[in-house]
Swiss-Prot record:
Reactions it catalyzes: uroporphyrinogen III + 2 S-adenosyl-L-methionine = precorrin-2 + 2 S-adenosyl-L-homocysteine + H(+); precorrin-2 + NAD(+) = sirohydrochlorin + NADH + 2 H(+); siroheme + 2 H(+) = sirohydrochlorin + Fe(2+)
List of residues that carry Phosphoserine: 128
CDD domains xrefs: SUMT (cd11642)
Organism: Escherichia coli O139:H28 (strain E24377A / ETEC)
The protein's annotated pathway: Cofactor biosynthesis; adenosylcobalamin biosynthesis; precorrin-2 from uroporphyrinogen III: step 1/1; Cofactor biosynthesis; adenosylcobalamin biosynthesis; sirohydrochlorin from precorrin-2: step 1/1; Porphyrin-containing compound metabolism; siroheme biosynthesis; precorrin-2 from uroporphyrinogen III: step 1/1; Porphyrin-containing compound metabolism; siroheme biosynthesis; siroheme from sirohydrochlorin: step 1/1
One GO term (biological process): siroheme biosynthetic process
Stretch list, region Precorrin-2 dehydrogenase /sirohydrochlorin ferrochelatase: 1-204
Protein name in UniProt: Siroheme synthase
A GO MF label: sirohydrochlorin ferrochelatase activity
């Protein structure tokens, strides 16, 4: 270990930055956030330093480097574009046994600055020891995505509860289970973020007073259309906290690889016209696992409230009194159209979008006359097997046969395939494609040749 990671208490302690440019400003922000009593020495300063000085947040000393400024300092940073000057600052600090950071020169410094994830009071620091700052930044960004934005507020609030929790729960095991429950409670985190004192109190009392083997909860998460990079930040956090993940066929392997390793995985895949697991049985799986006190994630492709039957599943939970929440996902219409270069709306071609299920029930009829109108985009989910019927009905009700159409297979995935043509060809085109596929009909499809960015990658 080349460096010892430490967290310094700098509040109301003298610190010095030598340099008045953009790099120095970034370092100054960190020291000001830490509460340091900051002096900045430079020949000239960018406007931000002047603004801080005018607000009484720091002291500016204009002129050449003055070593005496180090005499009362706890910490110094050399942040100029003059290597020789930076070396002088470092040596002067070393002579006074003051830790000094030299920007972009770790070998000349007595301490280095890590990449920081700030969820105060929770702080995470990542460093490559100065050997690969880009790697440290990438790791920081990955960790940022895993830590909820309001985690710091929850951590601070937890500190206020420590005494009461110690009184309430006799054993260390009980306390640990309580804290695990508190830190993953979305309602508490949101209430703290909104400063909703009533909700904070209600949630806290519920968490403290309910038995530790209480019923669990279900989180309905939209996995997006396929590309794992389109999974939302909150969705990622939920699947990495789950005890059980109940998922279907439209959830990609790449997304399942992000699921918490020791979580139970229950596959309930569905295909058009054939349900591998009946919907009622899926409802009962969610109910049964939650009643065991587990944190259950129901992971569905796209958005769970857009042709995902998410509402039906939640009704069962609601009737049983099981707590639940919903994390929306990018729906297939949005993802597939974007990755195919087809804007769903356009000032010249489409003022509205219609999302339509292609599962046409026996005896059920869509409003084909309105669907055939111009200046709109139609998106049919699960419509591959009904493509010929869709073609026939739209033409019968007045849609021009030359209306552009596209079918997107495995949208947003590396295996995405897109075929386009006209409405008169729709039934024939559908025979060349496999499920899952999305049908897009409208003048906007004509923009695909110009805007098709994904296939070029």
């Amino acid at each position: 270990m080349d460096h010892l990671p430490i967290f310094c208490q700098l509040r109301d302690r003298d610190c010095l930055i030598v340099g008045g440019g953009d790099v120095a400003e970034r370092k100054a922000r960190l020291l000001l956030d830490a509460g340091a009593r900051l002096t900045v020495n430079a020949l000239a300063f960018i406007p931000q330093f002047t603004a801080w000085a005018d607000a009484g947040m720091l002291t500016l000393v204009e002129g050449p480097f003055d070593e005496s400024l180090l005499d009362t300092c706890w910490l110094a940073i050399a942040a100029t574009d003059d290597d020789a000057l930076n070396q002088r600052v470092s040596e002067a600090a070393e002579a006074r046994r003051i830790f000094c950071n030299v920007v972009d020169a770790p070998k000349a410094a007595s301490f280095i600055m890590p990449s920081i994830i700030d969820r105060s009071p929770l702080m995470v620091a990542v460093s490559s020891g100065g050997t690969s700052p880009v790697l440290a930044r990438l790791l920081r960004e990955k960790l940022e995505s895993l830590l909820p934005l309001h985690l710091g507020q929850v951590a601070k609030y937890a500190g206020q509860l420590r005494g009461r929790v110690k009184q309430q729960f006799a054993t260390m095991s009980e306390r640990r289970r309580f804290w695990e429950k508190l830190f993953v409670n979305d309602r508490l985190a949101q209430s703290l973020a909104n400063n909703d004192q009533k909700a904070i109190t209600e949630t806290t009392e519920q968490l403290i007073n309910e038995p530790l083997d209480h019923r669990g909860e279900v989180v309905l998460v939209g996995a997006g259309p396929g590309d794992a990079g389109l999974l939302t930040l909150k969705g990622l956090q939920q699947i990495q906290q789950a005890d059980v993940v109940v998922y279907d066929r439209l959830v990609s392997d790449d997304i399942m690889n992000l699921v918490r390793r020791d979580a139970d995985r229950v596959f309930v895949g569905k295909r058009a016209g054939y349900h591998c697991v009946p919907q009622e049985e899926i409802n009962q799986i969610l109910l049964r696992e939650a009643q065991k006190g587990k944190r259950v994630v129901r992971l569905k492709g796209g958005d769970p409230f857009i042709f995902g039957r998410g509402g039906e599943e939640l009704e069962t939970l609601c009737n049983a009194g099981i707590p639940f929440s919903v994390v929306p996902g990018i729906t297939a219409a949005s993802g597939c159209s974007a990755y195919s270069g087809i804007p769903l709306t356009h000032r010249d071609y489409a003022q509205s979008v219609r999302l339509i299920t292609g599962h046409l029930k026996t005896g059920g009829e869509l409003d084909w006359e309105n669907l055939a109108a111009e200046k709109q985009t139609l998106v049919f989910y699960m419509g591959l097997n009904q493509a010929a019927t869709i073609q026939q009905k739209l033409i019968e009700h007045g849609m021009p046969g030359e209306m552009p159409v596209a079918i997107v297979e495995n949208g947003t995935a590396v295996t995405q395939r897109v075929i386009d043509g006209t409405l008169t060809q729709l039934g024939e085109l559908a025979q060349q494609m496999n499920s899952p596929s999305l049908i897009i009909i409208g003048r906007v499809v004509g923009l695909r040749d110009k805007l098709n960015w994904f296939s070029n990658h």
